[in-house]
Swiss-Prot record:
The gene coding this protein: moaC
Annotated positions binding substrate: 75-77, 115-116
Pathway(s) annotated for this protein in UniProt: Cofactor biosynthesis; molybdopterin biosynthesis
Keywords: Lyase, Molybdenum cofactor biosynthesis
The protein's name: Cyclic pyranopterin monophosphate synthase
EC number in record: 4.6.1.17
Assigned protein family: Belongs to the MoaC family.
NCBIfam families associated with the record: moaC, PRK09364.1
Superkingdom field: Bacteria
One GO term of the biological process aspect: Mo-molybdopterin cofactor biosynthetic process
Signal peptide: none
Role played: Catalyzes the conversion of (8S)-3',8-cyclo-7,8-dihydroguanosine 5'-triphosphate to cyclic pyranopterin monophosphate (cPMP).
Native source organism of the sequence: Bacillus cereus (strain ATCC 14579 / DSM 31 / CCUG 7414 / JCM 2152 / NBRC 15305 / NCIMB 9373 / NCTC 2599 / NRRL B-3711)
Classification via PANTHER family: CYCLIC PYRANOPTERIN MONOPHOSPHATE SYNTHASE (PTHR22960:SF29), MOLYBDOPTERIN COFACTOR SYNTHESIS PROTEIN A (PTHR22960)
Active site (catalytic residues): 130
Length: 161
């Protein structure tokens, strides 16, 4: 079992020294979702939310969040990201509509981009909530999870279904 790396010899928080780690291409894919009513789905689909184009704004928020992850996650290294892609897909069941959010992040560096992908997925869902809460505050933000990561010393990872 791996040990926690963000503690020093005194058991206090530290930022891990990555200066000896090899720079490699690293990717991460994270997912989240938000469940909305048919009314919100229709308003998003027809661009009728008063604050603007919900998916465009949420997409930009996700990209911005990935770029600023080290500002809000204390032990996260600031990274030069090579790419961030936020995509959406709708799934319907009865009168509930689930907006699936997938974020792909890529870099070439000494540490992974899992936190950037997870932060971006979360911020994207939160932005949808913020933009639509005037219509219905009962939206439900779903699980946020790492789907896949590649590169680095720990190797590749793919979430089991």
């Amino acid at each position: 079992m791996s040990s926690f790396t963000h503690f020093n010899d005194q058991g206090r928080a530290k930022m891990v020294d990555i200066s000896d780690k090899k720079a490699t291409v690293r990717t991460a894919i994270a997912c989240s979702s938000i469940v909305v009513t048919k009314e919100i789905y229709d308003k998003i689909s027809h661009n009728e939310i008063g604050k603007g184009d919900v998916l465009a704004v949420a997409q930009i928020a996700g990209i911005m969040a990935a770029k600023r992850t080290s500002d809000i996650i204390p032990m996260c290294h600031p990274l030069l990201l090579k790419g961030v892609d936020v995509s959406f897909d709708w799934k319907q069941s009865e009168e509930q509509y689930r907006l699936l959010i997938e974020v792909k992040v890529k870099t070439e560096g000494s540490t992974g981009v899992e936190m950037e992908a997870l932060t971006a997925a979360s911020a994207t869902a939160l932005t949808v909530y913020d933009m639509c809460k005037a219509v219905d505050k009962g939206m439900i933000i779903g699980e946020t999870y790492l789907l896949e990561k590649t590169g680095g010393k720990s190797g590749d990872y793919t979430r089991n279904s």
